[in-house]
A protein has these predicted regions:
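N-terminal secretory signal peptides that target proteins for export/translocation
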Residues: 1-11
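Formylglycine-dependent sulfatase
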Residues: 16-21, 29-461, 469-470
Length: 472
């Protein structure tokens, strides 16, 4: 190789200056080329989070009275997870676990409802933003709670808000935020060189509902519901309440469909990891806020045209929402140790993306942990109802640490850990029923033993087996 030598090319100040100027001029070009290459290699991330939906109420396994074609398409063109669980079954604690990849008992105040976010915890969105991603959210991010920087400015744990575009929703109870239009504004705000991570946090189907909207505006029928779950009275008001819940889920799905269409139009769909799930179970008695199957078991579907091998698979591995943050970091090529994030407990799902099989892909994913610390106020001294649980293929074990307390809040303050609803009213009215309907109240609001053990049954059979049949 011909080597330049000092004898043939004597150094001079002018030569060095020229070389430095040339190097400096070329650096922006090299940097842009590297950024463009990184953007091509790193996928976009669209995280779609419904507010209060139980499995199997979105996707291919949803009942006939809930139509979610866009979630179904995500699953059929990607992966459907049959055993996905929330680590904590309330809005803010579950979202904190999603953002950090940590269980709620590892999150300090962030494990609570209506909390202050501790400064020591960074979110995966913040980590991606610090490593070149364009980040933003529309709708509900981490909430309810307060997250601020040291100077008092708001801290956007789910990304900068995009909420200026509004619409006339189907009911007055739904949010006026036009989620899909705000997603378009977010995309328009991004540079061509940047991958993006967007959080679509719908406020639906969180309560309250416009009573009867599912029938009047959604064209639904009460008799389409094959059977009401066994821990609620089977009344017209309960069935109407369920149809209103379904109508709001379908609105979430339509907004998601518009977002997917936007990605397709812009040629970004296959380079986008689309993840669809909910933060916790449906806002009904014995579900949301409680440590039970319907509260923790969530729909989960993913699509990534460029990254998921053998799409259309159905996965039976036990996964937790805390697995999402490490998954997002890995596909983005971000090492958690190079971020402000604390160590994560969740495990990346990319091994499932690359697998050739369906069903149980990883035999080590045979259990998940759930629990809670403190949810809504209402007990003396603002006490919580701490609990832990473990879910396996066959059993769901729950440890209630304060069984002397009311699990859904005390009667004196109206059982505040259960949202007001026609179903809640029906359950409370059943308390004085002389024909044995008091059991509905006991299942939803009564005190519980220190330990509970349930046999896990196929979801299709849950309604037929009943609650009592599951208790060992």
């Amino acid at each position: 190789m011909h080597r330049r030598t000092p004898e043939r090319f004597p150094p001079s100040a002018a030569w060095l200056t020229a070389a430095l100027l040339l190097w400096a001029a070329l650096q922006p070009l090299a940097t842009r080329a590297q950024d463009a290459s990184a953007a091509e290699e790193r996928p976009n991330i669209l995280f779609a989070l419904a507010d209060d939906v139980s499995f199997p109420h979105m996707g291919p396994r949803s009942p006939e009275w809930i139509e979610t074609p866009h979630v179904t398409r995500v699953a059929r063109e990607g992966l459907l997870f049959n055993r996905a669980y929330a680590p904590n079954n309330k809005c803010a604690p579950s979202r904190a676990a999603i953002l950090t990849g940590r269980n709620s008992w590892q999150l300090g105040a962030a494990a609570n409802h209506w909390a202050y976010w501790p400064d020591r915890f960074a979110s995966y969105v913040e980590a991606l933003g610090a490593h070149g991603y364009h980040t933003g959210h529309t709708g509900k991010g981490w909430a309810p709670g307060i997250a601020k920087k040291e100077n008092g400015d708001p801290r956007y744990l789910a990304g900068v808000p995009f909420e200026e575009r509004t619409t006339d929703p189907p009911t007055d109870a739904m949010s006026e935020i036009d989620y899909a239009a705000n997603f378009r504004a977010f995309l328009d705000d991004a540079s061509d060189e940047q991958p993006f991570a967007f959080w679509y946090g719908a406020y639906e189907p969180h309560r309250g509902y416009e009573y009867g909207s599912g029938i009047r505006k959604g064209g639904k029928r009460r008799d389409a519901i094959e059977q009401v779950l066994p821990f609620w009275p089977d009344t017209d008001s309960v069935r109407t309440d369920l149809l209103d819940y379904a109508f709001e889920i379908e609105y979430f799905d339509r907004q998601l469909g518009r977002m997917i269409d936007l990605l397709r139009q812009r040629g970004e769909l296959d380079n986008t990891l689309v993840v669809v799930t909910a933060d916790n179970g449906m806002p009904f008695p014995r579900v949301k806020g409680q440590t039970y199957e319907r509260a923790a078991h969530l729909p989960l579907a993913m699509r990534w045209g460029n990254g998921i091998e053998h799409p259309g698979r159905v996965i039976e591995d036990h996964v937790s929402l805390i697995d999402l943050a490490p998954t997002f970091l890995e596909v983005a090529g971000v090492n958690r140790e190079n971020t402000r994030m604390k160590p994560v407990t969740g495990r990346s799902l990319t091994g499932i993306f690359n697998a050739e099989t369906e069903g149980q892909v990883n035999p080590d994913r045979n259990r998940v942990l759930v629990g809670k610390e403190h949810h809504d106020v209402g007990r003396p001294d603002d006490a919580g109802y701490p609990a832990r649980g473990i879910i396996t293929d066959d059993y769901f074990y729950v440890r209630n640490f304060k069984p002397d307390r009311w699990p859904a809040g005390p009667p004196q303050t109206g059982y505040l850990n259960v949202d007001g609803s026609p179903t809640k009213t029906a359950v409370l009215d059943a308390r004085t029923d002389p024909d044995g309907a008091r059991r509905f109240w006991e299942w939803s609001f009564g005190k519980r033993p220190p330990e509970e053990l349930f046999r896990q049954v196929l979801v299709e059979h849950v309604a037929r087996r009943g609650v009592a049949a599951q208790l060992l």
